[in-house]
Design a protein with these regions (language model features):
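Compositionally biased, intrinsically disordered or flexible polar/acidic segments
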Residues: 1-194
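Serine-esterase "nucleophile elbow" of acetyl-processing enzymes
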Residues: 13, 173-244, 261-272
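Beta-strand-rich extracellular modules
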Residues: 103, 149-151, 491, 503-507
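Short glycine/proline-centered coil/turn motifs in the loop regions
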Residues: 105, 456-459, 494
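Beta-strand signatures of extracellular beta-sandwich domains
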Residues: 112-114, 462-466
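Recognizes extended acidic, P/S/T-rich segments that occur
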Residues: 464-497, 507-515
Length: 531
């Protein structure tokens, strides 16, 4: 519920705000050494707004779009440049009710009122008539920047709006504390909720409830306050969780697309806001996502400000590390540099920090090597319809990986905030050998495969399958499976008599082997016995 929290401030007097002129007269550098250069802004201060007199405003808008690199649409640089008069006021990053009156239009014109780069109001200005509008702006930084421009017409960048700002006042809006604890997640693909057809890919945001709800059960609905189809709200015996994580987003694109604005419009005092970015910002060939390292700190600080100024509580979270094969030391990379910025901001600002990056490094060192292939999207061919040829993804998480990170986040929350309780699963001390393990020949388009299946163990996190020569025990391959089935394609050079050894795993605990053998008929495969 919104409430007014004080007297309205007139931004046209008292020196609270200032007027500036902005333009983008020169073309950007474009692609230079793998980084796209946009047009540079030229800004001249007009005056401080002292006496309350009307402000003459001009406005013009034009858009530009680059060509894609190598046909990749994600490399397209798009920019909307708004030129003319801007009113700028330094204000707390909270919710403000804005009242603005415009007049002095020279002709009837359809215009857009823009605040902090996001269009807020469309209206028609007419000669000899004043137009007053009121609206609420959830500021996502400690600054309000307002301009008015013509509604953009394709191919027409020459139209210049001339109008008069006769009144501009703001009044702080407060929100009541929510009836029950709430957690908002602003993050990227490693947190996002995924659909069933995208499995086994998963995000930790969709598993957080598992560790925060006493019965590990949640009612899951689409978050109707978000326009992203992946957004979900989790309701159960614990804090309500709004997972607004979305793939391919950085601090920049999350804000530019209005997603931070949408989230902040729902945040109330006392809410916890989890903020995890630092991956897509490093993509120099993705201009809409990229944030140079030397600019990243100010973006993180803006997010922290926008939560703190609402009397809500931010918690910064580092990204999980990239996949590295067992036995190798993970080299220092650019992701670490961005993570370090978030760690420093958290320390300097005194806000909570969950260093998933460090926690995951420690966890992986303690786990058997094959756990890495179960945590990351390292999929063998023919196992999942969404990835028929397999996948070797060093960033994104499986259901097991996402659940593992969710546990780290939940325990970090409990250590940082009163009233948060973690309901961890019992430690598995023993696993039985998988039951009903069988191997059957399965004909496929280009030959034959062996279909393996077994009874699922709810305590197991993943399974390891070792394929070997039934006579000599020579190991041909070792696979990891997240589900109680596996389709194995014959390998050149393997014997036709195959033995499969299956073990179930939970952390460092493994079961005894379950064995299954199969003999492939000679007419089914071009395999040559090399043993």
């Amino acid at each position: 519920m919104l409430e007014l929290a004080g007297d309205a401030q007139n931004l046209l007097c008292g020196g609270v705000a200032r007027a500036v002129k902005r333009d983008y007269p020169n073309e950007g550098s474009g692609w230079v050494e793998g980084v796209y250069g946009f047009r540079a802004m030229v800004e001249d201060e007009v005056r401080a707004l002292e006496d309350g007199s009307p402000l003459s405003m001009t406005g013009r808008v034009f858009a530009e779009e680059s060509q894609p690199l190598d046909g990749d649409a994600n490399t397209i640089a798009r920019a909307t440049y708004r030129c003319g008069t801007f009113v700028i006021a330094d204000l707390p990053a909270c919710d403000w009710r804005v009242r603005a009156t415009f007049g002095g239009a020279r002709r009837e014109e359809r215009v857009e009122l823009v605040v902090n780069d996001l269009p807020r109001i469309r209206m028609t200005l007419r000669p000899d008539t004043s137009k007053t509008v009121e609206f609420v702006v959830p500021l996502d930084r400690r600054r309000l920047e307002l301009c008015v421009v013509p509604v953009e017409m394709p191919g027409d960048s020459s139209r210049v709006l001339r109008a008069e700002l006769q009144e501009l006042s703001v009044e702080r809006v407060s929100r009541q504390r929510a009836a029950r604890p709430r957690i908002f997640v602003a993050a990227d693909s490693t947190s996002q909720t995924y659909f069933d057809y995208e499995r086994p890919q998963s995000g930790w945001g969709e598993w957080l409830y598992w560790f925060l709800y006493s019965d590990h059960a949640a009612k899951v609905d689409h978050d109707i306050t978000s326009d992203a189809k992946q957004s979900r709200v989790f309701i159960g015996n614990g804090p309500t969780i709004f997972n607004r994580g979305l793939g391919g987003r950085s601090l920049k694109s999350y804000r530019d697309e209005g997603r931070l604005d949408s989230l902040l419009s729902q945040v109330c005092p006392g809410d916890i806001c989890l903020i995890q970015f630092g991956c897509n910002e490093t993509s120099t060939n993705r201009p809409m996502r990229y944030i140079p390292l030397d600019e990243y700190r100010s973006w993180v600080e803006d997010y922290v400000d926008s939560v703190c100024d609402r009397d809500a509580v931010p918690c910064l979270i580092t990204e999980s590390p990239l996949y590295v094969e067992a036995g190798r030391t993970r080299p220092h990379g650019v992701f670490d540099d961005y993570a370090q910025v978030a760690i420093e901001v958290a320390r300097e600002r005194g806000v909570a920090m969950i260093d998933v990056r460090a926690l995951m490094d420690q966890y992986l060192l303690a786990m058997p090597g094959q756990a890495r292939d179960a945590i990351y999207m390292r999929l063998e061919p023919m196992q999942y319809a969404c990835h028929p040829t397999g996948l070797k993804d060093p960033i994104h998480l499986t259901t097991f990986g996402a659940k593992t990170v969710a546990g780290m986040v939940a325990r970090g929350l409990a250590a940082s905030f009163n009233g948060i309780q973690v309901y961890d699963e019992p430690v598995v001390e023993r696993l039985d050998a998988p039951a009903q393990f069988c191997a059957l020949i399965d004909r496929i388009v280009s030959g034959a495969a062996v279909a393996l299946s077994w009874q699922a163990d709810p305590r197991a996190q993943y399974y390891v399958i070792e394929k070997r020569n039934a006579q000599t025990k020579r190991v041909y391959a070792r696979y990891v499976s997240l589900k109680p089935e596996f389709l194995d394609r014959m390998l050149p050079g393997q014997n036709r008599d195959i033995e499969y050894a299956l073990t179930a795993w939970a952390d460092t605990v493994s079961s005894a082997e379950a064995l299954a053998t199969v003999t492939l008929p000679s007419s089914d495969s071009p395999c040559i016995d090399m043993d």
